[in-house]
Amino acid sequence: MAENEPQVQFKLVLVGDGGTGKTTFVKRHLTGEFEKKYVATLGVEVHPLVFHTNRGPIKYNVWDTAGQEKFGGLRDGYYIQAQCAIIMFDVTSRVTYKNVPNWHRDLVRVCENIPIVLCGNKVDIKDRKVKAKSIVFHRKKNLQYYDISAKSNYNFEKPFLWLARKLIGDPNLEFVEMSALAPPEIAMDPSLAAQYEHDLKVASETALPDEDDDL
């Protein structure tokens, strides 16, 4: 173990349909990208993402599927011993949100009670198809939800901070310095971000629809 290696480490699995931006998202963290390792037996890349908190550094070993989810589900070996997860969909593609319950089912079948964040990526694109009011799956399953835009770094740290607070058991945990991120490839429109934050707040205060399906 390297001298300044964080003592606190967690396996984080990143799941969701192919093309939703999972790899783009994890590659934003520059040291994680520089130090990633390829696990040939499972066909995954593991990115070590370190975050500095007021309780000391923590490391997420983020398992990224390297695109194999396009050929069907992932093997159990991918999920085994995961301590937390991010499920990602693309807000410009309804089918990727429709598949979220399948990813969640596979995940909790192997990892029963781990903290999970649902992320809707690509919110920088104006032509949004999956609106805040339609995103209800996380409320039914007690997950956390964030709009994100990997290419603009918008809300990049939010899923990791929420998971850290759950895993460490400290709701007041904070990140004390921001990780080095790749420069934004695009700018997130501040007025659009404000509108989406408002829409999510309104949606969170609206009663869930009665139907019992997962969409």
UniProtKB/Swiss-Prot annotation:
It comes from the Eukaryota. It is an enzyme of class 3 (hydrolase). The gene is ran. It comes from Carassius auratus (Goldfish). GTP binds at residues 17-24, 35-41, 67, 121-124, 149-151. PROSITE patterns: RAN. Residues 210-215 are annotated as: Interaction with RANBP1. Its main location: nucleus. Residues 36-44 are annotated as: Switch-I. Mg(2+) interacts primarily with the phosphate groups of the bound guanine nucleotide. CDD domains: Ran. Keywords: Cytoplasm, GTP-binding, Hydrolase, Magnesium, Metal-binding, Nucleotide-binding, Nucleus, Protein transport, Transport. This is GTP-binding nuclear protein Ran.
